Amino acid sequence: MTKYIFVTGGVVSSLGKGITASSLGRLLKNRGLKVTMQKFDPYINIDPGTMNPYQHGEVYVTDDGTEADLDLGHYERIVDVRTSKYSNVTTGKIYQEVLEKERRGDYHGATVQVIPHITNMIKKKIMRAALTTDSDVIISEIGGTVGDIESTPFMEAIRQMRREVGEDNVMYIHCTLVPLLHAAHEMKTKPTQHSVAELRSIGIQPNMLVLRAEQPIDQEHKDKISDFTDVPVDRIIESIDAPSLFDVPLEFQKQGMDQKVCDFLHLESPKPEADMEAWKKLDERAKNLEHKTKITLVGKYVELEDAYISVTDALQHAGYLYNTKIEVDKVQAEDITEDNIAEIMKDSDGLIVPGGFGTRGLEGMITAIKYARENDIPFLGICLGMQMASVEFARNVLNLEDANSAEAEPNCKNNIIDIMADKRDEENIGGTLRLGLYPATLKEGTKTREAYDNQDVIQERHRHRFEFNNKYREAFEKAGMVFSGVSPDNRLVEIIELPKKKFFIAAQYHPEFLSRPQRPEGLFKSFIGAASGLPAQKF
């Protein structure tokens, strides 16, 4: 029987529910259990695909082409699992499916209401994740905080789950904040008491508390919280601010979190405890890196940390392999000019230009890429970065001065980057991109193929609607550009490289989505190898 763990949050947002859920997932997985991660987002958008990165952060893409919350990236990187369309559900998706059923007459004339129709659809999404994965454990994170009006249907649905699948098969974990008042040098438990009271008022009694705090919580405060919340003191877990993300699962294990979860759910794991030795070595390496490598990231959304979180994480993963700390200098593309690019790049070991949409900042990206190419600074382009590298090459090597992308200038004479043929007639923005996992055939003798351990074919995740214009392929090749990765039918350019440079590779896909702390993605691995000049070191 599948076990269901629901992770909720109270007091404030951004408490780290996703990290808590991921860390528990990692511990259970390392006990030999099959774990599926799931995130419920209470916003009414169908998905985050059309949302402003400044509001939502990065849009994560799964193998099956789902545009999802960035927490799925945490799940994949920390737990080392692959997520899917069943892993991210929004209020918008729920209402869309319910309304489609109503229009088809599936409800046979009944009045469609939040209870039972919306809550039943939410439960169906939870159950579907279990049925499609055959998992031992489903860990579902509920976005927002307890008491939010948007989260109410989700809270009601998970309350009902206890009755539907049995009390022994459901566990509620509630994350709260225990703030420290510096003026009084005192920790306050009242916010946690109120948050749990709110949760209990809707019929959910938490079975475990995870307390976020700046410093360790003494026994007196834990006893007080236990008295007020009816949660046994041995199931109150501290989540102290940690210097490294890798510390969190290890700290949870020290407190016996995974064992307590297994005991509560009567869950027998293949291994008596989580084997975290490899994780400990990774944590030790991450804390004691002996070198530094500076990478300049030129992007459109650099003011928000979460906008490029998979990219910066992938850079760090590669850094662990080379025993080097990656210092990422984020530069707003709009601020770059021919006059200041040398100053911006003077101490940089490498340049990365990640994905994005729209026309803002494109000229700054092109200027930065030109500087990297002319000065043989290792360069990695991703999605929009690949497109701008192509435009830069056309302008400054092929001397096509008006070369551009059709996204920036639809009527451009030399549109090096053009809209994909099957996307020309699309009227909507949402859900109309080339999304998900696609194969690419790698050319023999290229640095790209070497980066992927000489594989013939790779599978990578995409999110774009523009592509390289094939009518320029011959001219590019004559000028020295190598198309080192193409679609199996040779119709789509997936990767370009300049073989005479130290490292100048750009990909139409998003390699960052498949990077893992213990398995850096191929292009990132080779990019940091070239930028650092260091030998790889096994963990």
Curated annotation (Swiss-Prot):
Residues 1-267 are annotated as: Amidoligase domain. InterPro entries: Class_I_gatase-like, CTP_synthase, CTP_synthase_N, GATASE, GATase1_CTP_Synthase, P-loop_NTPase. One of its GO terms (biological process) is pyrimidine nucleobase biosynthetic process. Allosterically activated by GTP, when glutamine is the substrate; GTP has no effect on the reaction when ammonia is the substrate. The allosteric effector GTP functions by stabilizing the protein conformation that binds the tetrahedral intermediate(s) formed during glutamine hydrolysis. Inhibited by the product CTP, via allosteric rather than competitive inhibition. ATP binds at S14, L15, G16, K17, G18, I19, D71. CTP binds at S13, D148, I149, E150, K188, T189, K190, P191, T192, Q193, K224. Its EC number is 6.3.4.2. CDD domains: CTPS_N (cd03113), GATase1_CTP_Synthase (cd01746). One of its GO terms (cellular component) is cytosol. It comes from the Bacteria. The keyword Glycoprotein does not apply. GO terms for molecular function: ATP binding; CTP synthase activity; glutaminase activity; identical protein binding; metal ion binding. Keywords: ATP-binding, Glutamine amidotransferase, Ligase, Magnesium, Metal-binding, Nucleotide-binding, Pyrimidine biosynthesis. UTP binds at S13, K188, T189, K190, P191, T192, Q193, K224. Mg(2+) binds at D71, E141. Pathway: Pyrimidine metabolism; CTP biosynthesis via de novo pathway; CTP from UDP: step 2/2. The active site is at C383 (nucleophile), H510, E512. It is an enzyme of class 6 (ligase). Belongs to the CTP synthase family. Catalyzes the ATP-dependent amination of UTP to CTP with either L-glutamine or ammonia as the source of nitrogen. Regulates intracellular CTP levels through interactions with the four ribonucleotide triphosphates. CTPSs have evolved a hybrid strategy for distinguishing between UTP and CTP. The overlapping regions of the product feedback inhibitory and substrate sites recognize a common feature in both compounds, the triphosphate moiety. To differentiate isosteric substrate and product pyrimidine rings, an additional pocket far from the expected kinase/ligase catalytic site, specifically recognizes the cytosine and ribose portions of the product inhibitor. Homotetramer. This is CTP synthase. The gene is pyrG.
